[in-house]
């Protein structure tokens, strides 16, 4: 899984129990991200089960994945679990490869009735060659092979990260639960990357941009108290988050231009890593949420207050500061039509730090805010085996621009509005399905142009069927509509459709599974970096690829 966009790395999912996509106005509760929703990763816990799962996979482009998930009970009050993963692969792109190692032990202690303590440790080492895609010409990506590489043969990225977390839950009684969390994350990273610049004729300019974290640390503390009765669910909480970044940066702009249709690659200069700036971002928040149910009607409300402070020290320059206090909110109604169907309406506002708070730009001295309005319906059919959901939404974001004195001189306003339809669950005991469709009308309100890399139509379908006792077959289709790279719809990325298939055979403790991705060999654009640079850093998606896996449970 790609990170949040600021770490420039990938996160292993080997110790993740499930990935929750929390759609809608979650921003006021969590205080981070957009009112459009968040992604929540739920880690595996040491719950006292005794098992060991071993999995190995081989696939296209010399891909190999090895995983171990082992759980044990040391005593009636202490449990342990450990997840390990090693990945290595070449790529469909020439000169691009990766090598990762991940280990995540966790211990659960039950010191007394109603008390649970979870201690987590995660360590990851990652080596990869950064891929910056292909340039564009005349409003389209250049038509070259997906394997084309425009970087330097000595480009690299190497990172080491360590995360330590503790979670303490105290069930005071049947109605009250008090949860406290603390986590510390430390990452050191170096990247040497050769990037495309501006296209002139059939040549594209290039620069080498080196950057690193030396280090980047994140400290998080959170406390929540939940009171739950038959008719009321109330949560009050507080959290503290601090990000410290020691950024190194250097560049070399002396590279000769490269031919866009026939890139000849070789080693590029390495300008090293020089101290550039130190940043500290501190956020302290308190929040309250309440859900009160009266008959078939539930009223939802929550409010959050944040105090945010940013400090920045660039090498050889005066210290810069940015601080503000903001209030986010959410309100909603849910009406239960019958035991199987409900309708709802909600509105929310949340605040975001420019550039996710990782640095200060004097021209963006005001925080962004996002407003969401949504109405929808949800139904559970076939004895709750199948969930249906429909929603109509509108998201407005305002990004104030300021002068060097912090005065607002302009506002960039964007609107995303559309519909979303979803069905997920079991049609029969043997047949699972997950299908979704979204229509999204997104535009810059001043220009009427689409934002970077936002599609108007999205459709996905995945279904599996249990064929006989041992066999399970599945397949899916994904469609992504027309998109553009860069501002003002500078480069048309087009639409695409991919088809994936799978087959699995299980007998006893053994499981063999085959996966085929993009089986029709669709040539498509996966995405582009945001802003002006995205017009010449456009990534092709993978052609047809295959994976064969074997798993055994002890």
Give the residues covered by each predicted segment.
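Acidic, small-polar-rich N-terminal luminal/periplasmic segments of exported/outer-membrane proteins
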Residues: 1-49, 54, 350, 375
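Structural signature of Gram-negative outer-membrane beta-barrels, strongest in the C-terminal barrel
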Residues: 110-112, 216, 231-235, 239-242, ...
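Surface-exposed loop/turn segments flanking beta-strands in extracellular/periplasmic regions
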Residues: 135-149, 199-206, 248-275, 320, ...
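Membrane-embedded beta-barrel scaffold of Gram-negative outer-membrane proteins
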Residues: 167-171, 177-193, 343-344, 367-442, ...
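Gram-negative outer-membrane beta-barrel transporters
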Residues: 228, 296, 394-396, 410-488, ...
């Amino acid at each position: 899984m790609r990170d949040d966009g600021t770490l420039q790395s990938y996160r292993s999912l080997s110790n993740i129990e499930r990935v929750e996509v929390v759609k809608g106005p979650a921003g006021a509760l969590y205080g981070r991200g957009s009112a459009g929703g968040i992604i929540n990763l739920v880690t595996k816990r040491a719950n006292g089960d005794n098992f060991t799962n071993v999995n190995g996979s081989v696939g296209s482009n010399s891909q190999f994945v090895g995983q171990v998930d082992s759980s044990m009970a040391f005593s009636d009050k202490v449990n342990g679990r450990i997840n390990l993963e090693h990945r290595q692969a070449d790529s469909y792109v020439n000169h691009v490869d990766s090598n990762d190692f991940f280990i995540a032990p966790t211990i659960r202690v039950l010191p007394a009735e109603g008390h649970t303590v979870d201690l987590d440790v995660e360590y990851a080492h990652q080596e990869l060659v950064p891929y910056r895609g292909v340039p564009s010409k005349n409003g389209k990506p250049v038509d070259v092979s997906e394997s084309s590489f425009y970087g330097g043969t000595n480009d690299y990225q190497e990172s080491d990260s360590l995360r330590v977390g503790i979670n303490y839950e105290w069930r005071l009684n049947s109605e009250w639960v008090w949860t406290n969390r603390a986590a510390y994350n430390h990452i050191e990273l170096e990247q040497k990357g050769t990037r495309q610049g501006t296209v002139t004729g059939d040549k594209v300019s290039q620069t080498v941009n080196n950057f690193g974290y030396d280090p980047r640390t994140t400290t998080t503390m959170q406390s929540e108290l939940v009171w739950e009765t038959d008719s009321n669910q109330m949560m009050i909480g507080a959290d503290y988050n601090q990000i410290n970044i020691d950024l190194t940066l250097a560049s070399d702009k002396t590279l000769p231009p490269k031919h866009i249709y026939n890139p000849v690659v070789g080693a590029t200069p390495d300008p090293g890593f020089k101290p550039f700036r130190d940043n500290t971002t501190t956020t302290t928040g308190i929040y309250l949420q309440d859900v009160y149910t009266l008959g078939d009607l539930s009223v939802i409300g929550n409010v959050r207050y944040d105090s945010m402070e940013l400090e920045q020290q660039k090498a050889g320059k005066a210290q810069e500061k940015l601080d503000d206090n903001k209030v986010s909110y959410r309100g909603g109604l849910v009406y239960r039509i019958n035991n199987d169907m409900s309708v709802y309406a909600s509105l929310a506002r949340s605040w975001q730090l420019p550039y996710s708070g990782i640095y200060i730009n004097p021209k963006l001295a005001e925080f962004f805010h996002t407003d969401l309005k949504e109405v929808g319906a949800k139904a559970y059919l076939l004895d709750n085996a199948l969930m249906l959901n429909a929603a109509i939404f509108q998201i407005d974001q305002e990004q104030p621009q300021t002068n060097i004195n912090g005065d607002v001189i302009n506002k960039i306003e964007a609107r995303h509005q559309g519909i979303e339809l979803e069905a997920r669950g079991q049609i029969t005991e043997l047949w699972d399905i997950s299908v979704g469709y979204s229509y999204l009308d997104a535009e810059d309100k001043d220009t009427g142009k689409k934002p970077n890399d936002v599609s108007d139509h999205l459709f996905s379908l995945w279904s599996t069927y249990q064929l006989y006792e041992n066999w399970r077959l599945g397949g899916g289709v994904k469609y992504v509509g027309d998109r553009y790279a860069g501002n003002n719809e500078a480069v048309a990325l087009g639409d695409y459709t991919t088809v994936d298939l799978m087959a699995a055979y299980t007998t006893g403790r053994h499981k063999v599974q085959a996966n085929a991705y993009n089986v029709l060999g669709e040539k498509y654009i996966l995405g582009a970096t945001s802003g002006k640079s995205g017009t010449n850093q456009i990534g092709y998606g993978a052609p047809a690829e295959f994976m064969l896996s074997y798993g055994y449970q002890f």
